Structures are given as C-alpha cells and as structure tokens.
C-alpha cells in the first residue's frame, strides 16, 4: 500500500497537518536565521527582553486585551501551567469540564495537588462536551477552548452565577484560531506549537485583574510552591519582559514572527475566518463522502482548528495515513489514546485552506486504490 504514489497535481503545497507540533511557515525560519545575533546572549539584557516584549505586545494586540489584563509567560508548556495553576490560581477547590485527554489531564493534576480540595469533574464522552457550569463551592472553573484529542471546541463564556470564581481556559490549540472575548476568561493560557506555529516548551497566559489578585493572595498565604511553578515569580519576571529561567530563543523568535504575520493580516478576525474556511472544506467533504463522517456529530461543537474524521469499518484509516505519509502528507494520524478508525487534521492559521481541499482529494484518491 505504501508504494502508491499520489499524483503531484493532487497534493497540497505543504503536507504538514499535525495538531502540534504544527506547520511552521518558511518565513518564520527566515526570521530565525535573521535573529542570529540573539542566540548565545543573555536573556536578562535588552535584545532578548525586547523580543519577549514584542511577543507580549503581539498577544495583547491579537486578543484586544482589556485594560488591567496582562500577558505572563514561563517555561514548560501548558503541561507545566496545569501544575502552576493548581498551586497558584486555585484557592480551595475547582470545577473541571472534561471531554478528552487534555481537559482531563488538568483535572488529574489538580486532584494530585495536596494543597487544594478534590476537584468537581463534569465529564462527557469524547466527541461531545458538557455545558459550562458553576458551583458555589468552587473558586476556579476550568475547561479547554479546544480539546485537541477529539476536535471538540467549547466557547469561552462565563457561566451564570459563577460569582468570583476564576474562569481558567486551556487554549493550547484554540488560541489564535478560534473566536474569543478575553473578558470572558480570567486566565487564557496556551503554548506556541499550535496556531502560533512555533516550538513547544513555553506557556503564555492572558490574565485578568482578578487572576492577578488571586496569584498575589495565594503567593502571600504561605502555601509551598516550587519556584519553577510559582505564578508570582512568573508575573514578576514577565512584567520585566523576562522568564524566571532561561527561555529557548528560537521558540520566541518563531512566535514573534507568527504574531506579526497574524496581526499584519488582520488579527484574530482574519485568523478565525481562515480556520473557518479550512474547517468548512473538511467537514463538507466528510459529510458528502460515502465512507467518511465527522467524529463530532454536533456541528456546534466541531472545532475550526482540529478536525477528526471517522472512516467506515471497511476503510483502514491507519493504512490511508501511512500512504499519505509516504507521499509527504504527514501527521494525519488520530490521537493515539482515542483508538478510533479516523484521521485527525490540524487546520491552524498557518495551514492554507487550499491545502485542506487538496488533502481531501488525496484521501479520496488513496481510498479508491486501497
């Protein structure tokens, strides 16, 4: 099967459809080469601090960050931020919506933390999602804007009667590709390797005045927190355009260039229209197909940035992905733990909608010949 050769005129111009790490634009790599003078220099000095400032300013512009909100960052990616939030944003107890691997992982991290109460977990099966909701016993309400493992997107909207509870949104794969009103969240956190077309290892968060006050209060409470996961330390350094420990300069350069590209093309509105175009092409193809169907049955929950497409039992999705990979069309395999006969397609802002259409034509071509 792997010897099938897809005609060149059918193939996408860029065959990268991974859900993270994701496609990096060639211009970003040129920016990386042009930034050579920054490599091997101190992250406490002006050149690198200016780069961090450029990233923070770019995020503020992209998300039209309200007055009083700020952008903080640290090393370790969203995985590290789960623990940082458990230590530094939850006062007593949290509520988590879980509907896939990554939304469940934050809840699991909180459950293991000895300084906070057992979380309330509202669970839905993969492919669906619970309605955002509140509980009077919690001071943090958390869910994922986009569940990367399943292709389910849940809008960011404060639940009724949420009171003073902080709304903490995992936007790892949603930020920069899905619509959002940042004022509806208190901590909107993400990483660069999805819509921002960069490398991993960094977390960033847009935080509200209420979140900043909570961070300060917990920081002064005497709760033990490892310095690496300390949000007060992250805030202190971020306001100086620094990270607590040495960042990867290349990651920051790629991120800064992608932010410039997004903002230069029209900002979040432009990016959302682009991902909507890509996803409409993918889902329309699947709905018209004789062998493929969108895994997420409710169109309102279907993600614009990560599409999961189930195949009929008589079509081996793994075999299709293998042929695609052999032809330079890569990372369409499903999330490993989901265990479904499907393809998963990233449609982040850097992905050309025309390439999504080309991908669907290639899948049809391969399936006809298997």
From Swiss-Prot:
Predominant cellular place of this UniProt entry's protein: cytoplasm
Entry binding sites for L-glutamate: 44
Keywords: Amino-acid biosynthesis, Aminotransferase, Cytoplasm, Pyridoxal phosphate, Pyridoxine biosynthesis, Serine biosynthesis, Transferase
Pfam families (alphabetical): Aminotran_5
Enzyme Commission no: 2.6.1.52
Annotated positions of the N6-(pyridoxal phosphate)lysine modification: 194
Superkingdom of the source species: Bacteria
GO cellular component terms given for this protein: cytoplasm
Localization (cell): Cytoplasm
Cofactor: binding comment: Binds 1 pyridoxal phosphate per subunit.
Region (Disordered): 1-22
Keyword check for Transferase: yes
Listed pathway(s): Amino-acid biosynthesis; L-serine biosynthesis; L-serine from 3-phospho-D-glycerate: step 2/3; Cofactor biosynthesis; pyridoxine 5'-phosphate biosynthesis; pyridoxine 5'-phosphate from D-erythrose 4-phosphate: step 3/5
Function: Catalyzes the reversible conversion of 3-phosphohydroxypyruvate to phosphoserine and of 3-hydroxy-2-oxo-4-phosphonooxybutanoate to phosphohydroxythreonine.
Subunit structure: Homodimer.
Protein's recorded name: Putative phosphoserine aminotransferase
Species annotation: Mycobacterium sp. (strain KMS)
């Amino acid at each position: 099967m792997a010897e099938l050769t897809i005609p060149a005129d059918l193939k996408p111009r860029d065959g990268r459809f991974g859900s993270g790490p994701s496609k990096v634009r060639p211009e970003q790599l040129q920016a990386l080469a042009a930034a050579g003078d920054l490599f091997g220099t101190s992250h406490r000095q002006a050149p690198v601090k200016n780069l961090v400032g450029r990233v923070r300013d770019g995020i503020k512009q992209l998300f039209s960050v309200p007055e009083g909100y700020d952008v903080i960052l640290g090393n370790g990616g969203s995985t590290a931020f789960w623990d940082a939030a458990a230590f530094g944003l939850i006062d007593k107890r949290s509520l988590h919506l879980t509907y896939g691997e990554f939304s469940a992982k934050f809840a699991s991290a909180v459950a293991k933390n000895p300084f906070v109460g057992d979380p309330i977990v509202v669970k839905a099966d993969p492919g669906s999602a619970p309605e955002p909701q509140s509980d009077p016993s919690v001071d943090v309400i958390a869910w994922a804007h986009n569940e990367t493992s399943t292709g389910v997107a849940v809008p960011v909207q404060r639940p009724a009667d949420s009171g003073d509870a902080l709304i903490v949104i995992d936007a790892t794969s949603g930020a920069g590709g899905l619509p959002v009103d940042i004022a509806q969240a208190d901590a909107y956190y993400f990483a660069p390797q999805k819509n921002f077309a960069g490398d991993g290892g960094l977390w960033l968060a847009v935080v509200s005045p209420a979140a900043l006050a909570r961070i300060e209060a917990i920081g002064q409470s005497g709760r033990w927190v490892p310095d690496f996961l300390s949000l007060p330390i992250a805030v202190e350094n971020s306001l100086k355009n620094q990270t607590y420990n040495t960042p990867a300069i290349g990651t920051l350069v790629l991120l800064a260039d992608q932010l410039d590209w997004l903002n230069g093309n029209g900002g979040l509105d432009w990016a959302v229209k682009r991902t909507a175009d890509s996803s409409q092409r993918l889902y329309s193809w699947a709905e018209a197909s004789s062998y493929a169907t969108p895994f997420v049955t409710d169109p309102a929950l279907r993600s614009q940035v990560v599409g999961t497409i189930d195949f009929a039992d008589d079509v081996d999705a793994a075999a299709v992905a293998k042929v695609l990979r052999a032809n330079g069309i890569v990372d369409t395999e499903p999330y490993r733990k989901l265990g479904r006969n499907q393809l998963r397609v990233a449609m982040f802002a850097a992905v050309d909608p025309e390439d999504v259409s080309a991908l669907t034509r290639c899948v049809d071509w391969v399936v006809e010949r298997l």
